[in-house]
Amino acid sequence: RIVQAVAPRPGQRLIEIGPGEGAITLPLLREAGQLTVIELDRDLIPRIQAAAQGVGELEVIHADVLTVDFTALARGGTLRLVGNLPYNISSPILFHCLEHAGAIADMHFMLQKEVVERMAAPPGSKVYGRLSVMLQLVCRVEPLFRVPPGAFTPPPKVDSAVVRLTPLPEAERPDADPVRIERVVRHAFGQRRKT
């Protein structure tokens, strides 16, 4: 279902963050013909490369995704990002991607369901917070579908969900320093429990 939601087409610059054992890597590669993966775990890279033999053109970047310059990687075009993000560092990865929104066409991520709910929360909602504000200032956030624990081996203790993030046109994004906006939002939501 993730691959159907992404609907990759040949010629698009598709980047998978953290392919792990390659559960969605091969279906993406089959559809797109070429795929770049960013993987930190050096031990997984040969397995992914071996599995991709004869399926399509696979480029592997061995790096921490938080150090990857997506704007440079786009080479003047736009990227489509996909990934089953590690739940413990999903927010830093999302904020890092926002820094490169101008080089990204869309993002499809599987995350903990509660994180997706916070990302898409409307103002006034109990779960509306810093993550909601920062993402919605830059992207359209569309929760797509829930993924039950049984879809994984071993099954996690939490439900997951897939979300689509589509960066807004530059004219619709705030014309202000993102660092300053983030500081104000962090301060505002840091104070809300004290009132």
Where are these predicted regions, by residue range?
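Catalytic cores of RNA-modifying enzymes
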Residues: 1-187
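Pseudouridine synthase
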Residues: 188-195
